[in-house]
Amino acid sequence: MHVPQAEQLGQAITSLRPRQIGAIPLVYPILADLGVRQITNDLVPTEADIDMGRIVLLLTLNRLLAPQPLYHVQDWLAETVLPQVLDIAPEKAYDNRLGRALDRLYPHLGELWARLASQAIQVYDLDLNVLHWDITSIYFEGAYTDSELAAYGYSRDHRPDTKQVNLEVDVTHDGYVPILYHTLPGNTADITRPLPHLSRPRC
């Protein structure tokens, strides 16, 4: 862990107010090594009091450690050491603000992922000679009538009553770090993907 990160976490932990620490000291340094905040801010600059990089860090940590809807992130944040670590007051992390941030981030997701993957390859000296590929699915509650991706299909979650989106992922052999991903309509058959997918890692 870098010294500034350790000092930030240490100051938060010594607070007299009880707060959740959990796996933050393990996960936060990895996000810092990957340069999540700086890469995000380079792609989506803002003059707001909370930069996009910190919002992405907050939402990433929430998704990894305690996944919940946007309207609960504010309450979760208040119970953790992250207000001190990220310098984000809980009252400023309301759901509409987080939603607008995600809308701004969406057009840049491909470039953001590419830069983060490149950073991970360099920082952790990942071996790309062998990649493992697989398809999974994520199901959604609701109609999603205007979605081009959400569709009924083979449900790996045993939820044939819900629409889903398929996700194909390539991970490294050493550590199973995700390097490439591609979203697919939920009714895509696995058997149709190997040949088209072979061209993607070479691009």
Predicted stretch roles:
Residues 1-151, 161, 168-187, 195:
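Dynamic "connector" segments at or just before major functional cores
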Residues 191-203:
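Short, basic/hydrophobic alpha-helical segments
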